[in-house]
Amino acid sequence: MNPKRSFQALILTLHNYWADKGCAVLQPYDMEVGAGTFHPATTLRALGPKPWKAAYVQPSRRPSDGRYGENPNRLQHYYQYQVILKPNPSNLQELYLGSLKAIGLDPLLHDVRFVEDDWESPTLGAWGLGWECWCDGMEVSQFTYFQQVCGIECSPVAGELTYGLERLAMYVQGVDNVYDLNFNGREGEEKISYGDVFLQAEQEYSRHNFEFADTSMLHRHFIDAEKECLALLAAGAPGDNDNQRLHKCVFPAYDQCIKASHIFNLLNARGVISVTERERYIARVRDLAKACGEAFLLTDAGGLNWNRAA
């Protein structure tokens, strides 16, 4: 399949490229997240000493970015391609440029530039040194060296690559409207466009995000998710008689943190959160993320026993 002819071929090409580089090609996380970084394969696995390589597509939702399907390049639901490499390889930029070449953007034939743009996620308590990648004057992706995640220092530093798949596909296919993207690589009656797949959903979710979402219920759900996250962390905490001192309920707790984050984004889209309240909500989600990150370090995946074995 030609990555210049279909959205799905672009994804498959990136899958094959990063699989050849040793990454575990994972599936999207089955929850509403604001970015690929929220996937536990990045947020949690970036912590601790254990090496980790993964790549995946992540459907991402940013309710406030909806435009009822009327904007050609702004969406409330879109796709990111995420790569996480820990420890970050010395040739990360070279690997990234190789991936561009694989999808048909030869750096020798295009004006590829890296523009310094440090990255931050306040709700995840995460930040890193980063660069946007611009190709012929348009941003197509970003790479970041994580310094902190969940308010915890990353040691070793992990390298993260994030591709905006719709924007990248629009560039390689040469179209100006995201809904005109060829999705399946066929032409004529067999052609399926991005709009065929997603336009109606984009229109309906814009109505939901801006007009219909029940704000009273969302406020209650936020509190419920916050309480459940903390309760699960407390229930799974290692006891005094646990010889391994392992935490036993990190991932279910982190799911509740993700839920709280998405609910906050919906409340923000509905316009019912003041500037002061917004900062408080962000701090509450960040506290949950920090607690989940600290608990993850008390697990095998977080490197507790791996450290001991070393």
Curated annotation (Swiss-Prot):
Location in the cell: Cytoplasm
InterPro entries reported in the protein's UniProt record: aa-tRNA-synth_II/BPL/LPL, Gly-tRNA-synth_heterodimer, Gly-tRNA_ligase_asu
Keywords noted in UniProt: Aminoacyl-tRNA synthetase, ATP-binding, Cytoplasm, Ligase, Nucleotide-binding, Protein biosynthesis
Family: Belongs to the class-II aminoacyl-tRNA synthetase family.
Broad class of enzyme this protein falls into: ligase
CDD domains, per database record: GlyRS_alpha_core (cd00733)
GO MF annotations, alphabetized: ATP binding; glycine-tRNA ligase activity
Name listed for the protein in its UniProt record: Glycine--tRNA ligase alpha subunit
